[in-house]
Amino acid sequence: MAETKKTVRAAAAQIAPDLTSADGTTARVLETIREAARQGVELIVFPETFVPYYPYFSFVQPPVQQGPAHLLLMERAPTVPGPMTDAVSASAREAGMVVVLGVNERDHGSLYNTQLVFDADGALALKRRKITPTYHERMVWGQGDGSGLRTVATRVGRVGALACWEHYNPLARYALMAEHEEIHCAQFPGSLVGPIFADQMGVTIRHHALESGCFVVNATGWLHDDQVRAVTSDEKLQAALRGGCHSAIVSPEGKYLAEPLTEGEGLVIADLDLALIAKRKRMMDSVGHYARPELLSLAIRRDPATTTLALPCAGYPVTSESAAAGTEPEPEIPGPLRRGLHSPLGH
């Protein structure tokens, strides 16, 4: 891996998906990477679940009516890895750019809100799933696990990512801070709730930058008026699919490095001087000299979740020690089962 750069040109992409085609949205991603490369961008962040699109229908349609839209999203959702990730990987490699992309990942019969980090050589450095879908999203996505609550070393530095209201889970943010995150990649859907969502987002990302002493690159999506009408014909509900955009780049001192984009499509671009991280942490390092781990600490389960667990068979091998003692060996109880058991398993 190349030596970490001292200055990084970053971009937050606020663009509209293709609500009719996963390939169309992927083409928009590749086109935007090429455009960013022409402007010297070295890291780009796309909105939450941008491929094929955020499930806006789940916010404005009653659950009993969501079946057709939900099934269509499942049909269009990519697998990871798959043709979509191959295309983005090749584009990242060609541009020499770190790409952070949100997707609806299909894993057999379930969908997940998944964040992908491609390094500048095209390698998929991180795949993580949103640990708790928010409100209406629970009708669409499954829950992620703790295996992705980590940062990854990339050509531009240590990168971490969270999606939307995961930023209101302080322990999730602290997990990334504890791994000395340098560039935090935040993703929100955009075109949702209204201006209050954008205002809250600004407070949220600036607070994380200040508390963690890292840069934050935040990307939100955008819907055109015809797309809003395609999601719902109810004019009152259409108002819930406008506003809520706040693509921005924030320094470790909590300052905007470029004017946030709250309307329309475009790229927010800024140069990140990584020396500012040490300047900020010299005064307050929340996971270093300003921490009190003997008083307050975080426990994380990073083992991947699984729906099955292999158990030992009923007959346990007799060892020389147990034979000499005339006893049967105690079974090895797997950790996930051992937690919460009040007594050993019977023979």
Located regions from the model:
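Short beta-strand scaffold segments in enzyme catalytic cores
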Residues: 101-103, 114-117, 150, 247-249, ...
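C-terminal beta-strand edge segments of enzyme domains
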Residues: 220-347
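Short hydrophobic alpha-helix segments
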Residues: 121, 127-128, 260
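Active-site glycine-rich loop that binds ribose-phosphate moieties when present
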Residues: 134-152, 167-171
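N-terminal glycine-/serine-/threonine-rich phosphate-binding loop
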Residues: 1-43
